[in-house]
């Protein structure tokens, strides 16, 4: 299976825009042929190789409008897997692992398009959760485990803090866009953020997670913001006191 993905890997990272565009269209058709539960699945390694190529496909794209269009196209590739829960979870995981791995190599001139891609993928993830049903605890559990394991990991020192900050900054923005009726299981969605407040070793990350939980828009989902602010600050202060005590123990 890996050999079949090799042409896409080379063409998607080409400096020729027409070749990249053609390769992306061919890739969509290829992925559709492997999207059903009865088809031969792509391995985790195949998905990581594809995402590395897609990462550099965006890397090579210039002009902001074209970059945004491509980022949206990359997010829409997720829809190919809509009927296969196993692969769609693996697809999201490969995306986040790729972004985390390549983050340090993104220069300042290219950062904006990747920040936009991440925004697209946070939104797409929530859209997929909505399409599966907000009451689908099994799927939601697996999806938010991916977020908690990679971009919002509390303990993994290999995850860049910059990635954590950006996801926290846009988390409620994208939830608001997807769940206009405020029907989503908000506590399940906020669980990765709460885990950061309680378990992260980084003080700045903890504070930023607390700010996310104190977003006034969360009132629309029934979150008690006043209590949340106090509770978050108490947890942050307690965690920092424990760290200070440990330093002098």
PLM segments and residue spans:
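Charged/polar, solvent-exposed surface patches and flexible loops
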Residues: 10, 25, 29, 52-56, ...
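Eukaryote-skewed repeat-based solenoidal scaffolds used as protein-protein interaction platforms
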Residues: 60, 71-186
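Short coil/turn segments at helix-helix junctions and helix-capping linkers
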Residues: 7-19, 53-66, 101-110, 154-159, ...
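Extreme N-terminal segments of fungal proteins
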Residues: 1-85
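Eukaryotic acidic, Ser/Thr-rich intrinsically disordered low-complexity regions
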Residues: 2-6, 173-249
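Extended alpha-solenoid helical-repeat scaffolds
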Residues: 12, 18, 25-33, 77, ...
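HEAT/HEAT-like alpha-solenoid repeats
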Residues: 2-6, 36-55, 88-99, 125-148, ...
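Short, flexible/disordered secondary-structure transition segments
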Residues: 19, 37-38, 65, 106, ...
């Amino acid at each position: 299976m890996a050999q079949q993905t090799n042409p896409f890997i080379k063409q998607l990272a080409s400096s020729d825009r027409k070749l990249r565009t053609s390769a992306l269209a061919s890739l969509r058709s290829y992925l559709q042929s492997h999207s059903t539960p009865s088809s031969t699945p792509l391995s985790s390694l195949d998905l990581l190789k594809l995402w590395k190529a897609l990462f550099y496909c965006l890397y090579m794209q210039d002009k902001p409008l074209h970059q945004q269009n491509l980022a949206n196209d990359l997010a829409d590739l997720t829809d190919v897997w809509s009927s296969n829960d196993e692969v769609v979870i693996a697809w999201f995981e490969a995306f986040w692992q790729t972004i985390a791995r390549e983050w340090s190599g993104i220069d300042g001139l290219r950062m904006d398009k990747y920040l936009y891609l991440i925004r697209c993928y946070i939104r797409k993830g929530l859209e997929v959760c909505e399409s599966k049903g907000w009451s689908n605890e099994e799927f939601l559990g697996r999806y938010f485990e991916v977020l908690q394991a990679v971009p919002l990991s509390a303990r993994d020192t290999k995850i860049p803090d910059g990635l954590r900050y950006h996801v926290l900054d846009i988390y409620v923005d994208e939830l608001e866009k997807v769940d206009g009726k405020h029907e989503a299981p908000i506590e399940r969605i906020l669980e990765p953020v709460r885990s950061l407040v309680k378990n992260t070793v980084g003080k700045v990350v903890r504070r930023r997670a607390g700010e996310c939980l104190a977003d006034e828009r969360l009132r629309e989902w029934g979150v008690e913001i006043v209590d949340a602010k106090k509770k978050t600050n108490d947890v942050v202060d307690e965690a920092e006191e424990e760290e200070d005590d440990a330093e002098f123990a």
